[in-house]
Curated annotation (Swiss-Prot):
SUPFAM superfamilies: L9 N-domain-like, Ribosomal protein L9 C-domain. This is Large ribosomal subunit protein bL9. Keywords: Ribonucleoprotein, Ribosomal protein, RNA-binding, rRNA-binding. One of its GO terms (cellular component) is ribosome. Binds to the 23S rRNA. GO terms for biological process: translation. PROSITE patterns: RIBOSOMAL_L9. It comes from the Bacteria.
């Protein structure tokens, strides 16, 4: 099935590309998510007329994501306290939701889906590097310091 992409899609293409995908992928994912429209003559003409508007909108979203990534990088570190044993091993773990809440409390709005933990959840006290994927092309890093509670 031929579709026109309205957004950048990983491993498929970027805005304006006409790609051939399986019908189920288009019907169940791309079209409902607003990432593509079927490539009919009417849709091709409509897209070409609105191409500049869509590209400007995509550029605005990218600029906003880069601004948020800069704010995250400027934070340098965020401290989270959690109950821990004698050797610094946490009772439980610190996951994406806890990190997103701590960063949001520090002043930068972050969703838990944007937090990337390359080594899994944090289970020990100390300093950990956490990655954020704010946009498909924009990444940020932040040090999270886990301190044991008394």
């Amino acid at each position: 099935m031929q579709v026109i992409l309205l957004d950048k899609v990983a491993n498929l293409g970027s805005l304006g590309d006409q790609v051939n995908v399986k019908a189920g992928y288009a019907r169940n994912f791309l079209v409902p998510q607003g990432k593509a429209v079927p490539a009919t003559k009417k849709n091709v003409e409509f897209f070409e007329a609105r191409r500049a508007e869509l590209e400007a909108k995509l550029a605005d979203v990218l600029a906003a994501a880069e601004a948020r990534a800069t704010k995250i990088n400027e934070l340098v570190s965020v401290t989270i306290s959690s109950k821990a044993g004698d050797e610094g091993k946490l009772f439980g773990s610190i996951g994406t939701r806890d990190i997103a809440d701590a960063v949001t409390a520090a002043g930068v709005e972050v969703a838990k889906s944007e937090v990337r933990l390359p080594n899994g959840v944090l289970r020990t006290a100390g300093e950990h590097e956490v990655h954020f994927q704010v946009h498909s092309d924009v990444f940020a890093k932040l040090n999270v310091v886990v301190v044991p509670e008394a």
